[in-house]
Amino acid sequence: MKSVRYFFEYIIIKFLFFIFSLLGYSRASNIGEKIGKLFGPLIRDNKKILHNLEECNIGNNDHDRTVIVSEMWGNYGRILAEYPFIKHFRNSNLSKYITLEGKDILDEIIREKKSVVFISAHFNNFELMALCLEKAGIDLAAIYRPLNNFFLNNTMENIRKKYICRNQIKKGKSGSREILKFIKQNFSIALMIDQRVSEG
């Protein structure tokens, strides 16, 4: 039954990608935000998220936390809608939406052939960090968590390897060995600090 559900999810996402690609970047991103806010709470119960925010003392009151959760879902909706346009970020058609700060630091890393660890989190379109680093000339490998939906995971892996970062490291024990291999080859590593890793 899970395979059937995954297949239908895959069909829905592929259909949305097709529609978003027809709408153009800005319109698709804005509509994606609305879709995220509308359907996000159906995917994951807001009560647990609100409870976690309160436990972490984030937001002054319930209203503030509700706004934060709504914006979170909107952000995920935008990210979903922007996947069909990742290739355009790569080939500079959408570069006007990206501001790269610290280019001199990247130039130093390249010039001195340093191996460093780039750390970010799931802010806005988190895929763009690795894309911009590799595009700037950094020898890079990025750690990723495979999706549970194996139908959709193949699509996402293809997008990541083709347009974001050629060297993708699957999190876990085997990934730990790959990280060491890339570091020995003087590659830098990109990772998300808030990524769930229970092994390796």
Q: Where are the regions that the model predicts?
A:
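Membrane-anchoring hydrophobic helices of lipid-metabolizing enzymes
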Residues: M1-S120, T155
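Soluble catalytic domains of membrane acyltransferases
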Residues: K87-G200
